[in-house]
């Protein structure tokens, strides 16, 4: 399960207004994160049926839940499977523990479940609330990679970790994006590992948190993809939305750190429907619909579809932290669509 997020505040100037109202989803670029932190959620088999009936072709789960993995058998749904932060130390310290984890949670299902990525840790930094896990991320990634390779799955399943915008020391303008000094020694070896193994970097990208952290300088239309014209001119790059700016700042940081060939997969992005500033059903609907439409075309810095996972499938009434954390769902626990988004 994704932990409570502390998002960096990104200062950007904004202009304009336009609303995009219709959407179709690129089946190869959109997934939805499935969190289970609620006491009123459907069964795993019901959830898989809901994905299939809505044409959602990819899923992220935050731990190797056996009911979910079993329900995924034969579904053709592609999967990001997380190694929870609490498991990092054991998998980093003992290669046999990593091999057992991979055998039990991946190999045993791999003939019928379409694993795409293993996310070894979520939003871990050497500073902040998850700092105690930082030293274990790369060793755990290496041990999981070794186990995946031993199973002959290295071409099918890529090992990565899920980061977020807090790794950036500078993010504006996007071309000046760079990793903060206290993060560089942590992230640079991870970048080298990803490059060596042909794996993407997973990144949770949230314009919502950037906007709510600095509403004096960031306008809502820029965060919602509804600005009518160029908001940020960054050399030859023109930005009409904050999502692109955040993602390209991370790409710029990767380039400066020797990871210019790495792909970024957006492993989470969403907007809450209640519980905080600008958290309304209308804003969330606008964000999700426009995001789905937008990621088919790339960013100013990187062309091509952006593989993206929406956060999240359901409202989760047992999430901790900010009240907004409970209200990111695309569906209610009763399996009703909150936004009437077409997935076909």
Swiss-Prot record:
Record EC number: 3.2.1.39
Active site: residue positions: 123, 268
Molecular function GO terms recorded: glucan endo-1,3-beta-D-glucosidase activity
Reactions catalysed according to its record: Hydrolysis of (1->3)-beta-D-glucosidic linkages in (1->3)-beta-D-glucans
Signal sequence extent: 1-27
Pfam families referenced in this protein's UniProt entry, alphabetically: Glyco_hydro_17
Cited function: Implicated in the defense of plants against pathogens.
UniProt-recorded name of the protein: Glucan endo-1,3-beta-glucosidase
GO biological process: carbohydrate metabolic process; defense response
Family: Belongs to the glycosyl hydrolase 17 family.
Matches recorded under SUPFAM superfamilies: (Trans)glycosidases
Keyword field: Glycosidase, Hydrolase, Pathogenesis-related protein, Plant defense, Signal
């Amino acid at each position: 399960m994704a932990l409570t997020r502390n998002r960096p505040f990104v200062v950007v100037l904004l202009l304009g207004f336009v609303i995009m109202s219709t959407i179709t989803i690129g089946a190869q670029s959109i997934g939805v994160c499935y969190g289970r932190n609620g006491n009123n959620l459907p069964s795993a088999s019901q959830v898989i049926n809901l994905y299939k009936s809505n044409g959602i072709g990819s899923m992220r789960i935050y731990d190797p839940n056996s009911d979910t993995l079993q329900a995924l058998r034969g579904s053709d749904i592609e999967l990001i499977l997380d190694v929870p932060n609490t498991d990092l130390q054991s998998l980093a310290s003992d290669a046999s523990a990593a091999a057992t984890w991979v055998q039990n949670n991946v190999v045993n299902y791999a003939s019928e479940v379409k694993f795409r990525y293993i996310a070894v840790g979520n939003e871990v930094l050497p500073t902040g609330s998850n700092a105690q896990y930082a030293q274990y991320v790369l060793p755990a990634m290496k041990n999981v990679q070794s186990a995946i390779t031993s199973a002959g799955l290295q071409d099918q399943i890529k090992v990565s970790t899920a980061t977020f915008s807090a790794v950036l020391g500078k993010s504006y303008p996007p071309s000046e994006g760079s990793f903060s000094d206290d993060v560089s020694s942590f992230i640079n070896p991870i970048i080298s590992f990803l490059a060596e193994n042909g794996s993407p970097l997973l990144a949770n990208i949230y314009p919502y948190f950037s906007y709510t952290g600095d509403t004096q300088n960031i306008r809502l239309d820029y965060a919602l993809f509804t600005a009518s014209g160029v908001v940020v001119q960054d050399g030859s790059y023109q930005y009409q939305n904050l999502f692109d700016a955040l993602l390209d700042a991370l790409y710029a940081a990767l380039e400066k750190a020797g990871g210019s060939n790495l792909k970024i997969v957006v492993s989470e992005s969403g907007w809450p429907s209640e519980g905080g500033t600008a958290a309304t059903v209308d804003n969330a609907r606008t964000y999700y619909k426009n995001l789905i439409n937008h990621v088919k075309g790339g960013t100013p810095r990187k062309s091509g579809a952006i593989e993206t996972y929406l956060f999240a499938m359901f409202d989760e009434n047992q999430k901790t932290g900010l009240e907004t954390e409970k209200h990111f769902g695309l569906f209610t626990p009763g399996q009703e669509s909150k936004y009437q988004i077409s997935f076909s």
